[in-house]
């Protein structure tokens, strides 16, 4: 657990102040990235991890998550140039493709859902100011913002999707409400829970 890692790294640093401490974590409890961050904050200077966290048992610290966290959230030097962070998503996808594995749509930073806005109010706020729901600009890590049309969508989602297609639609167009109702009705029948 992160607090145990902090205690252990702190103890080693006190006993061996000149040592270059490293950390190698596994994700058996889902804490590989958090434990690695705790170690770095406590003084570890060498981090071991893998692309997409692939490793034995439940995997290792995911460098695709860890690198932007350390650089963008903690201001750490990682050896990766900031102007190359935009290659993280393509690197993640390349490995998944090579090992014939579907990408994790919910992966932090690089997953397709990481910057997807599904709910109507959520999308409306994100359109006005993406910082309301996005912790970084998605382009920083090679990702992109998406406004999803779903059963939770409002006008903002639909208008954003039309804009992407080059179609101008006024938010007060009465046909828009009809379209939204029909799409939501159709989506009800595509759910796994539908009878």
Language-model features and meaning:
Residues 77-112:
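Phosphate/diphosphate-binding loops
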């Amino acid at each position: 657990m992160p607090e145990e890692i902090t205690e252990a790294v702190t103890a080693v640093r006190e006993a061996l102040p000149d040592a270059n401490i490293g950390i190698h974590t596994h994700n058996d409890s889902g804490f590989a990235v958090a434990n690695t961050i705790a170690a770095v904050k406590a003084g570890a200077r060498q981090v071991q991890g893998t692309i997409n966290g692939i490793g034995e048992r439940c995997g290792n610290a995911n460098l695709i998550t860890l690198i932007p966290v350390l650089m963008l959230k903690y201001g750490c030097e990682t050896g990766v140039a900031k102007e190359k962070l935009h290659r993280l998503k393509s690197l993640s996808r390349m490995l998944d493709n090579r090992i014939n594995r579907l990408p994790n749509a919910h992966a932090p930073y690089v997953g397709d859902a990481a910057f997807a806005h599904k709910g109507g109010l959520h999308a409306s706020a994100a359109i006005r100011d993406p910082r309301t729901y996005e912790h970084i600009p998605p382009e920083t890590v090679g990702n992109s913002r998406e406004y999803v049309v779903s059963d939770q969508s409002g006008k903002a989602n639909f208008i954003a999707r039309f804009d992407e297609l080059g179609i101008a639609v006024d938010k007060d167009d009465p046909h828009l409400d009809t379209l939204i109702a029909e799409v939501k009705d159709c989506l009800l029948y595509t759910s796994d829970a539908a009878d």
